[in-house]
């Protein structure tokens, strides 16, 4: 599933740090992993990303093969999250469950279930809004955000376009 993902994520980002938008890290599941399990590879991959990229969080996508193996990805995520004190979000979205739109929905539901509500904002803007389902595919968000700001509306967060994981 990941083989053709390099540089296909064209959604722009305003992030000033290292842009990993184009990166798609993977566990490189082999036939032996399918037979004997891939838990160790997933843990090693998460450890590698944490050691080399120092992320605020990691999203792990369950693909067709990993779903069929049946490894307890949620348990791995909980252990890695506790060990490293970062969010590790599991998105159960194997391709055989449905369309790309369903995959996007499953990703959004994972964020809602595993991230939203884990902390409150430091300040609350009286006219703050959250954009849900905004993908900023061609940078269109950057066109209307200034208009909203001119009329006193502040975009507090965006799911999933030009969003950030603040923990």
Predicted stretch roles:
Residues 1-167:
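An N-terminal assembly and electron-transfer interface module characteristic of large anaerobic redox
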